[in-house]
A protein has these predicted regions:
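Sequence/structural signature of beta-propeller domains
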Residues: 1-181
């Protein structure tokens, strides 16, 4: 399983139950670094939908973290803190964070994630599509376009706010460890 090829101490950081499809969605904390990964490759968070009664995976989606070279406001985003499902709007709210503390440039964002239009990649043969074992080993600058050419799409996201920019206390790095509706 690709999940055994993750960074040490980087498991499923958050889970959210989707009351619309009755699946439990698990968000891996940090981008995985499978064999072939190079610095500068895509920062992908995997989202696994599991039947909570049987533990059987039902779907898997790819969530692309913003790259530090795309936007300075997203520099350092490397972790998912928590997730919650909003049944009224059919979206997930997740927190992104970096490891900074005590700095107004710290990134502690809350982001809305929508699976509408995202491709279920569970059991995808990446070797056939990308000539690689996993999409994480693909170059960041062309991954999204090349996958779209194969009709594979990432989750959609809307950045809602960054806690430090709202005046939140900056004394610790894990201020977005919990979300609730």
């Amino acid at each position: 399983s690709v999940y055994s090829d993750r960074r040490t101490n980087r498991g499923f950081e958050s889970m959210a139950f989707n009351t619309d499809d009755n699946l439990l969605y698990a968000f891996i904390q940090s981008p995985m670094r499978p064999e072939g990964y190079l610095d500068g490759n895509a920062e992908i968070i995997r989202v696994l939908a599991v039947d909570p009664y049987t533990g059987t995976p039902q779907a898997e989606y790819l969530h692309l973290l913003p790259s530090a070279d795309i936007s300075a406001k997203n520099a350092g985003v490397d972790k998912v803190g928590d997730a919650v499902y909003d049944p009224h709007r059919g979206v997930f709210l997740i927190s992104w964070r970096d490891s900074s503390d005590g700095d107004t440039t710290a990134t502690k964002r809350v982001v809305e994630v929508d699976l509408l239009g995202a491709t279920n990649v569970l059991d995808t043969d990446w070797q056939t599509i990308l000539c690689l074992t996993q999409p994480e080993a693909y170059a960041t600058d062309s991954l999204v376009d090349d996958m779209a050419a194969e009709d594979i799409y990432f989750t959609n996201r809307v950045e809602l706010f960054n806690l430090p920019s709202l005046g939140a206390h900056l004394g610790f790095d894990k201020m977005t460890e919990g979300l609730a509706l």
